[in-house]
């Protein structure tokens, strides 16, 4: 990203050194607002016909993609529990709070600004705020204070019952997995719905581990590739983006033995055989996908969380 910005600042409008990149939502917004990306090409790819357009493939962190990004994988915030320990998991923020009170010290979340920790804050915010439509736009100070008030009230109630009484937080989801395996925690968190399946296969989680989410839905997103406006080989970049959408590539990528990255294809649009294979590699019984807040909320949430809870 820095290279693209540097070349633009130097006036290099053609012959750029970057042809295709995997970009996150915050960086996409930055590049798009600066007019540094090609637009209108993604849905012209031949393999777009297989894409599941019920997924958020036309927006990235609530920013319309306008054909400037091609999807190639999905993700969704997902809880993990052990069926032998937690056969009935919490299904709402309120029942999660009740679960934590009933099982003190066994619930936690990764310390923001860890990506998954911040996603957990976003998840709670979406479900607790009385004004979810405000999350579609970047916040100003007044909006932020009003919309997030229920979140901080909830966390103030939750934290005393967390692992280490909410005075310390795991640095990563991997640390949570280890604590779940050791039976210290009752829940772990991931942003890959296939994560539990992968970790069971590798022996990093017990065979009784399973994925679940809140009944109303869990936030999810799509990861994309994009082409800089000054790309030197944009035609070749589109060939690669199209390959990433091919059924063969998506099936291999979805294989837990290879990566286990969720597909962005609609199984019903695939030929027999490929359809069944893809369905077998997709986690079952996932909750609905909730759109993420606008990218402008991320840093604001992280900074306020650190101000309130990060000095323990």
Cite the ranges covered by each PLM segment.
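Short, hydrophobic alpha-helical packing/hinge segments within bilobed ligand-binding/sensory domains
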Residues: 1, 28, 176-177, 237
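Early extracytoplasmic/lumenal segment of secretory-pathway proteins
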Residues: 1-30
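Hydrophobic residues within well-ordered alpha-helices
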Residues: 4, 31, 176-181, 227
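Extracytoplasmic ligand-binding site segments that recognize negatively charged/polar headgroups
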Residues: 18, 24-174
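A ligand-binding cleft/hinge motif common to bilobed small-molecule-binding domains
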Residues: 28-30, 187-206
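Periplasmic-binding protein-like
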Residues: 61, 75, 154-158, 205-226
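Conserved C-terminal helix/tail region of periplasmic/extracytoplasmic solute-binding proteins
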Residues: 178, 283-312
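Mature extracytoplasmic/periplasmic domains
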Residues: 218-219, 223-289
């Amino acid at each position: 990203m820095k290279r693209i910005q540097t070349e633009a600042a130097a006036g290099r409008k053609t012959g750029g050194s970057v042809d295709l990149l995997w970009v996150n939502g915050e960086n996409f917004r930055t590049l798009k607002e600066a007019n540094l990306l090609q637009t209108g090409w993604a849905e012209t790819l031949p393999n777009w016909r297989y894409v599941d357009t019920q997924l958020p493939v036309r927006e990235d962190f609530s920013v319309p993609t306008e054909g400037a990004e091609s999807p190639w994988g999905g993700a969704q915030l997902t809880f993990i529990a052990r069926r032998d320990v937690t056969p009935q998991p919490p299904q709402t923020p309120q029942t999660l709070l009740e679960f934590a009170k009933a099982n003190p010290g066994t619930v936690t979340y990764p310390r923001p600004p860890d990506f998954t920790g911040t996603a957990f804050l976003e998840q709670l915010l979406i479900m607790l705020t009385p004004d979810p439509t405000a999350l579609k736009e970047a916040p100003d100070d007044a909006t932020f204070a009003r919309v997030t008030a229920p979140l901080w009230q909830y966390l103030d109630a939750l934290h005393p019952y967390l692992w280490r009484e909410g005075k310390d937080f795991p640095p990563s989801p991997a640390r949570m997995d280890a604590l779940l395996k050791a039976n210290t925690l009752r829940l772990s968190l991931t942003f890959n719905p296939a994560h539990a399946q992968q970790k069971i296969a590798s022996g990093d989680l017990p065979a009784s581990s399973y994925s679940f989410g809140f009944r109303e839905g869990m936030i999810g997103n799509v990861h994309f590739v994009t082409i800089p406006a000054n790309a030197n080989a944009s035609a070749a970049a589109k060939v690669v983006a199209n390959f990433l959408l091919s059924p063969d590539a998506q099936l291999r990528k979805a294989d837990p033995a290879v990566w286990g990255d969720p597909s962005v294809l609609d199984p019903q649009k695939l030929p027999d055989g490929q359809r069944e294979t893809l369905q077998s590699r997709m986690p079952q019984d996932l909750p609905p996908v909730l759109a993420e807040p606008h990218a402008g909320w991320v840093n604001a949430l992280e900074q306020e969380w650190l101000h309130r809870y990060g000095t323990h």
